[in-house]
């Protein structure tokens, strides 16, 4: 029972941190004092659940990684057409950001500017994994469909992910007014015409 209560409090702390990142407070550095006040506990209570603020951010990064990578793997299991796989992965990344504005501040690096460098490295690694996955999807086209792209897969993958990262940054910069999935079908038509 005590373990379950501790787990619930950890989750409550992470949800409060994500909520703060989504609010106007997320545009500036979030302190443990502000977070403790948001959760309704003392700073000492926060540290009973997490040894540092960096570990709190790591908890959110782990959630982002698990959510995105598990869904990308599901897309790869269920869809075999290369362009449809790419479309679904890009749409997933944009929709996840749109549904989780506070986490988008982490994904864009904005919330990590004044935090431990290890956190920025972890987000960079996540995007490198996603780019590697995109590159692999593009490379498999030759095996699956007997077609190749006019440009090297490495360049295409970087371009596709760069488009997503630009949308995430625009979403954060606009204080979440610009929706990343807005006009996605037109956006995809433009991108797919360039890579066919």
From Swiss-Prot:
A single Gene Ontology biological process assigned to it is: cell division
- One GO MF term: transcription cis-regulatory region binding
GO CC, any one term: cytoplasm
DNA-binding region of this protein: 31-50
Top-level division of the source organism's lineage: Bacteria
> Which residue numbers delimit the HTH tetR-type domain?
7-68
Question: Which PANTHER family has this protein been placed in?
Answer: HTH-TYPE TRANSCRIPTIONAL REGULATOR RUTR, NUCLEOID OCCLUSION FACTOR SLMA
Instruction: Give the similarity note.
Output: Belongs to the nucleoid occlusion factor SlmA family.
Subunit-structure text: Homodimer. Interacts with FtsZ.
Q: What is this protein called?
A: Nucleoid occlusion factor SlmA
| Species assigned in the record | Vibrio vulnificus (strain YJ016)
The beginning of the lineage is: Bacteria, Pseudomonadati, Pseudomonadota, Gammaproteobacteria, Vibrionales
């Amino acid at each position: 029972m005590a373990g379950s209560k501790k787990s619930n409090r950890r989750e409550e702390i992470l949800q409060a941190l994500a909520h703060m990142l989504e609010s106007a407070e997320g545009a500036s550095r979030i302190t443990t004092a502000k977070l403790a006040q948001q959760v309704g506990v003392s700073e000492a209570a926060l540290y009973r659940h997490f040894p540092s603020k960096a570990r709190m951010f790591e908890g959110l990064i782990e959630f982002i990684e698990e959510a995105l990578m598990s869904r990308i793997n599901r897309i790869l299991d269920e869809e075999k057409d290369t362009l449809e796989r790419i479309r679904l992965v890009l749409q997933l990344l944009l929709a996840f950001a749109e549904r989780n504005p506070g986490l988008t501040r982490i994904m864009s690096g904005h919330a990590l500017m004044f935090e431990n460098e290890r956190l920025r490295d972890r987000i960079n690694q996540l995007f490198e994994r996603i780019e590697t996955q995109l590159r692999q999807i593009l490379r498999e086209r030759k095996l699956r469909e007997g077609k190749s792209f006019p440009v090297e897969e490495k360049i295409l993958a970087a371009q596709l992910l760069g488009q997503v990262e630009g949308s995430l940054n625009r979403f954060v910069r606009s204080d979440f007014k610009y929706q990343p999935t807005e006009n996605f079908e037109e956006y995809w038509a433009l991108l797919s015409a360039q890579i066919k």
